[in-house]
Regions:
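CE4/NodB-like, metal-dependent polysaccharide N-deacetylase domain
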Residues: 84-105, 121-125, 147
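Acidic-and-aromatic substrate-binding clefts and catalytic sites of carbohydrate-active enzymes
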Residues: 22-25, 45-53, 77-82, 108-113, ...
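A short, structured active-site edge motif that brings together acidic residues
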Residues: 65-78, 101-108, 135-138, 156
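Conserved, mostly hydrophobic/aromatic
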Residues: 17, 34, 42, 54, ...
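N-terminal binding-site loop/beta-alpha segment at the start of enzyme catalytic domains
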Residues: 1-68, 98
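Beta/alpha (TIM)-barrel catalytic core signal, keyed to glycine-rich beta->alpha loops juxtaposed to Asp/Glu
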Residues: 107-160
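Short, acidic/polar
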Residues: 22-35, 79-96, 114, 137-143
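Short acidic capping loops at alpha-helix termini that bridge into adjacent secondary structure
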Residues: 64-68, 98-102, 126-130, 151-154
Length: 160
């Protein structure tokens, strides 16, 4: 598996297993299967409503936590500093982990600046190993990066 080194030195698998549109009921089984065939990055999001299934599968897998790279994303209804801060802790609880490897802002809407401040704080506290954004166009990314202390380490984009 190819590894990418992020700007802060965190190593991330280049390829991962995404659980978008995987029902909460099926998520644990699907992630367990993905881990059993060698996937070591699992990509979920608050909006997918299946973080708990990811957490259960990783916990039950017997694979050391530091060998599984977990990505999640804060949904726009949780933007703003306080809501984002609370939602990060909720994701940690659902994923049954003390840290998330990469946490992203899911979309460039609403109070993304407040939400990103919450990411920065959780990153400094060690709750998040890396932070970034998802689905940001270049102008959104440049604007955000110009107004924060910790630059986004990832801009995850959907391609077909």
């Amino acid at each position: 598996m190819k590894i990418i080194k992020l700007s802060n030195g965190v190593e991330m698998p280049q390829l991962g297993y995404g659980v978008y549109q995987v029902t909460p009921e099926e998520c644990e089984r699907c992630v367990s299967d993905a881990l059993s065939v060698g996937y070591r990055m699992i990509d979920t999001a608050q909006a997918y409503h299946n973080e708990e299934g990811v957490g259960r599968a990783v916990k039950k897998s017997g694979i050391a936590r530091d060998e599984v790279f977990i990505v999640s994303k804060i949904w726009i209804s949780n933007y703003g500093y306080e809501k984002a801060k609370t939602s990060i802790d909720e994701s940690l609880r659902k994923l049954q982990t003390e840290y998330i490897d990469l946490m992203l802002l899911h979309q460039p809407f609403c109070d993304r600046y407040g939400a990103y401040r919450a990411l920065e704080e959780a990153y400094r506290e060690g709750k998040l190993r890396a932070i970034g954004v998802s689905n940001f166009y270049p102008d959104h990314l440049i604007d955000l990066a110009s107004n924060v202390d910790v630059k986004p380490m990832v801009n995850q984009v959907e391609t077909h």
